[in-house]
UniProtKB/Swiss-Prot annotation:
Record's comment on post-translational modification: Phosphorylated.
Organism from which the protein derives: Human herpesvirus 7 (strain JI) (HHV-7)
Keyword Ion transport in annotation: no
Family, per entry: Belongs to the herpesviridae NEC2 protein family.
Functional description taken from the UniProt entry: Plays an essential role in virion nuclear egress, the first step of virion release from infected cell. Within the host nucleus, NEC1 interacts with the newly formed capsid through the vertexes and directs it to the inner nuclear membrane by associating with NEC2. Induces the budding of the capsid at the inner nuclear membrane as well as its envelopment into the perinuclear space.
Gene behind the chain: NEC2
Transmembrane regions listed in the UniProt entry: 229-249
Topological region Nuclear: 250-258
Subunit structure: Forms a heterohexameric complex with NEC1.
GO cellular component: host cell nuclear inner membrane; membrane
Name of the protein in its database record: Nuclear egress protein 2
Classification via Pfam families: Herpes_U34 (PF04541)
Keywords: Host membrane, Host nucleus, Late protein, Membrane, Phosphoprotein, Transmembrane, Transmembrane helix
Subcellular location: Host nucleus inner membrane
Perinuclear space topological domain residue ranges: 1-228
Length: 258
């Protein structure tokens, strides 16, 4: 007997995987299903030209219930419905052989389990089969199973290796970017230490003083060019001071001669 928690989990998983809205499915009542588990757990109205993850849902059901789940497609005349069973019902309306393209006329059914899907897959690993409903003619539909993925095991392994190498390359690039960012954000002392230069405060201060002394001859002409009036006043004052000093020396020389 299916537990209530498992019942709810199957319904929620089905809606999530197939991306169903409230109007897209009908659920069998819990009490009715517990009395007769041969009823379908839910009936789903499938849309045209929409890719449903059928293989993933079948494998999920089997993993949760440990039973061979079976989905039955039926042409109701105006659309295709899918009834989801925990296991094969006692009476199956038809015994169709599952192919990649299956034509369903009115009231015809197609029973599908996980083994049927795996039988038509081009490779057993790395391929997920999806189901697409298409209109064939007036009242007939096509149930098409499309495999997405490499067509051979060697292609699948090569694809995995390429993905892993690409992932490692991107991770190495990110690591180098983080290292460069941390180096830029380091204080001056740590930056100098990381590149093997002077690390003491005295050596850093000496380096700053040497830099200032080297720049001083260059900064004087720049200061004079930007402050013409002030420089002219200073030159005039300097000339006046020199004239006064020269005059004092001349007077003292005259007195000594007398």
């Amino acid at each position: 007997m299916l537990k209530e928690k498992m019942y709810d989990e199957l319904i929620l998983s089905t809606c999530r995987v197939l991306k169903l809205g409230p109007a897209d499915f009908r659920v069998t009542d819990k009490n009715l299903f517990s009395k007769n588990p041969k009823f379908p757990l839910c009936d789903i109205l499938l849309k045209l030209d929409f890719a449903y993850s059928l293989e993933y849902l079948l494998s999920l059901w089997e993993d949760l219930t440990k039973q061979e789940a079976r989905f039955i497609f039926k042409n109701t005349g105006g659309a295709v419905s899918m009834s989801c069973y925990l296991h094969a019902p006692i009476k199956q309306e038809s015994q169709n052989i599952v192919k990649e393209c299956n034509i369903l006329n009115v009231n015809e059914c197609l029973s599908v389990c996980l083994n049927d899907i795996e039988a038509i897959k081009p490779s057993s690993s790395g391929v997920l089969t999806k189901c697409i409903i298409r209109r064939n003619r007036d009242a007939a539909f096509i149930v098409e199973f499309v495999a997405f993925g490499p067509e051979s095991e060697s292609e699948y392994i090569a694809l995995l290796k390429a993905i892993i190498l690409k992932k490692k390359f991107l991770e190495r690039q990110d690591l180098e970017k983080h290292r460069a960012a941390r180096h830029i954000k380091k204080p001056l002392r740590l930056q100098l230490k990381s590149v093997g230069e002077m690390t003491s405060f005295r050596s850093i201060n000496y380096m700053g003083n040497t830099k200032d002394a080297a720049v001083f001859p260059v900064t004087v002409p720049i200061f004079a060019r930007r402050n013409n009036i002030l420089c002219g006043f200073l030159v005039a004052a300097l000339l006046i001071v020199c004239y006064v000093i020269f005059k004092e020396f001349a007077l003292s020389a005259d007195f000594s001669a007398v």
